[in-house]
């Protein structure tokens, strides 16, 4: 088994969170879905349209308009919102995420 195969298997078993499904967030989420088809993707976005598209296109497995307990399952979380919102979302995530989450 090659290193790339081992890495792909590892990343396929992980859960990724995306806070923000704009151009950057949705692009990264789509890239993860293409590369790691069996991974789990949790997504937050205020726009219902963006959430519905992510679910419809099978980019996200779960999409919500609030930072909720599902983010506690994430191994990695990507903050893809305008910088001025990051502090707020980090505070929301702090009490939910597991200690090993990056």
Can you say where each PLM-predicted feature lies in the sequence?
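NAD(P)+-binding Rossmann beta1-loop-alpha1 motif at the extreme N-terminus of oxidoreductases
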Residues: 2-66, 72, 76
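Rossmann-like NAD(P)-binding element
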Residues: 62, 67-102
């Amino acid at each position: 088994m090659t290193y790339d195969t081992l890495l792909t298997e590892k990343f396929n078993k992980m859960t990724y969170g995306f806070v923000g499904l704009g151009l950057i967030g949705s692009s990264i989420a789509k890239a993860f879905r293409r590369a790691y088809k069996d991974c789990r993707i949790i997504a937050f976005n205020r726009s219902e349209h963006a959430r519905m598209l992510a679910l419809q296109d099978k980019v996200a497995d779960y999409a919500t308009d609030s930072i909720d307990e599902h983010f506690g399952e994430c191994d990695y979380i990507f903050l893809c919102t305008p910088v001025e919102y990051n502090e707020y979302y980090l505070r929301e995530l702090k009490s939910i995420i597991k200690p090993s989450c990056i």
